[in-house]
């Protein structure tokens, strides 16, 4: 029983740990709900201008989730909401609409992603959406140095940067926000509770109102599990794909069938003319972690698929190198 984890004493300990985790999150939520946050009225102009410039319409699910967020933002207590939805469901647009409420009320918005590649993708999207509307979108990453870094930090500190996109660099002590009203975190499961509260605490140190917090995840989490693991969060689900979007199929295949997977990649790229992405946990091989490394996998796939052009992209590459790929 001990080896299988089924001993009554073990199960009791597990139960008590889960209860303690749940209670601590609920207590944290109750504490945060007593703290003042900026009440952000629904956007009357900016959201309409943003949607008018897009070549598509929002789905019913996007509208429903956007209303849930707007109802939270109207309150003078901090929003804590998790938005779930498959890849392609339109979470980024929902985040953009949420940003409109804060921006129109003259508050800053910070969007944080776990990797530089994902953060840069958001930066390009939000810059394309918001700069034509007269808003300044700033970029901040750990790799920025010298004058570029100082200029970005100065814009954030003075409020000249109304929308700030970045990575963990947004956590750093020397990054000061002038008037932060909304924090958006993508792939929130990549951040711990302590990490996702760090930006809030930055404002508490400045005796400023706590910003609202919106988290997004494409990882399918059953609602009951979300209620257990993220007891401090309200949950919204975008359960509808835009017209023309194919539902995502997720399949787990053991590494023993690696050659089968490579054959499927070959068929998809050559026969069907598609692109394939092979995502690895690490950049280089590690003696401490048993995980696939991007550089080793790239070499392997080049040998296994000589008829294909196999590219490599990772966070340590220079922007020009990534752009070339």
Predicted regions mapped to residue ranges:
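Inter-lobe coupling/hinge segments of SF2-like helicase ATPases
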Residues: 35, 64-67, 77-325
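Generic, well-ordered alpha-helical scaffold segments in large soluble proteins
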Residues: 21, 25, 49, 53, ...
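Conserved pre-motif I regulatory segment
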Residues: 35-84
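Generic surface-pattern signal
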Residues: 20, 52-55, 270, 306
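Upstream accessory/linker segments immediately N-terminal to the RecA-like ATPase cores of bacterial MutS
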Residues: 1-53
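Generic alpha-helical structural element
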Residues: 7-11, 39, 55-58, 214, ...
């Amino acid at each position: 029983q001990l080896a299988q984890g089924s001993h009554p004493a073990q199960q009791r300990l597990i139960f008590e740990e889960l209860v303690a985790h749940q209670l601590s999150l609920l207590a944290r939520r109750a504490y945060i709900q007593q703290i003042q946050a900026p009440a952000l009225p629904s956007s009357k102009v900016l959201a309409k201008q943003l949607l008018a410039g897009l070549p598509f319409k929002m789905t019913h699910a996007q509208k429903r989730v956007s209303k849930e967020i707007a109802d939270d933002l109207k309150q003078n207590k901090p929003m804590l909401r998790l938005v779930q939805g498959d890849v392609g469901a339109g979470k980024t647009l929902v985040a953009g609409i949420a940003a409109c409420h804060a921006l129109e009320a003259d508050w800053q918005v910070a969007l944080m992603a776990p990797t530089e590649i994902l953060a840069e993708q958001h930066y390009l999207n939000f810059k394309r959406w918001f700069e034509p509307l007269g808003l300044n979108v700033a970029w901040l990453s750990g790799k920025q140095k010298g004058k570029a870094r100082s200029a970005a930090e100065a814009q954030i500190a003075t409020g000249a940067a109304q929308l700030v996109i970045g990575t963990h660099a947004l956590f750093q002590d020397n990054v000061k926000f002038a008037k932060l009203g909304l924090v958006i975190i993508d792939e929130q499961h990549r951040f711990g509770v302590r990490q996702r509260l760090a930006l809030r605490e930055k404002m508490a140190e400045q005796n400023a109102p706590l910003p609202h917090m919106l988290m997004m995840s494409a990882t399918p989490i059953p609602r009951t599990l979300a209620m257990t693991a993220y007891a401090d969060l309200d949950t919204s689900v975008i359960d509808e794909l835009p017209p023309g979007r194919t539902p995502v199929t997720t399949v787990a295949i053991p590494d023993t069938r690696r050659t089968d997977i490579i054959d499927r990649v070959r068929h998809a790229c050559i026969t069907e003319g598609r692109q394939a992405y092979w995502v690895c946990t690490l950049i280089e091989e590690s003696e401490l972690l048993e995980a696939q490394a991007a550089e080793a996998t790239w070499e392997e796939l080049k040998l296994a698929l000589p008829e294909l052009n196999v590219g490599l992209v990772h966070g340590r590459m220079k922007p020009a190198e990534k752009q070339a790929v």
